[in-house]
Amino acid sequence: MKQTILIFLISFLFSSYSYAFEGQVILITDGDTITVVNNGKPEKIRLYGIDTPESKQAFGNQAKNFTYSMVYHKSINVEPVTTDRYGLTVGIVNVNEKCLNSELIDKGFAWVYDRYCKKDMCDKWRLLEKEARQSKAGLWSQDNPVAPWMYRRNRNK
């Protein structure tokens, strides 16, 4: 019985573990959502731990354009973290030894999404956000930027 439980636990751990993969970016939906060709199939990826302005928000297009300039038609590495409620892979995206997630924060095009950002790197990202705020980079040049989750909440009322 103990052996059966042990085998089950080991197989469960390995089945839920997601491996990093390489792919080419074919579409930029917005600043924090891209589509990558993975094993010949398109896969939508949501960037882990961050939230960029919505398309109709101030700096929404700039965030999308920044993401486009960093990854469009480039080979990237995706480190899956989880799957969201819509079935999208949520992950960390690296291109040319740079992390897209952290670059968006550093340039002032994204908030750290504290509700979901729980990995160790999130502490570093919070410091990057603080520095971007202090230097008034990107969206932080506005007097009162509205976080995307607040924008969505208010829009849906």
Whereabouts are the PLM-identified features?
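Small beta-barrel nucleic-acid-binding modules, primarily SNase/OB-fold domains
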Residues: 2-157
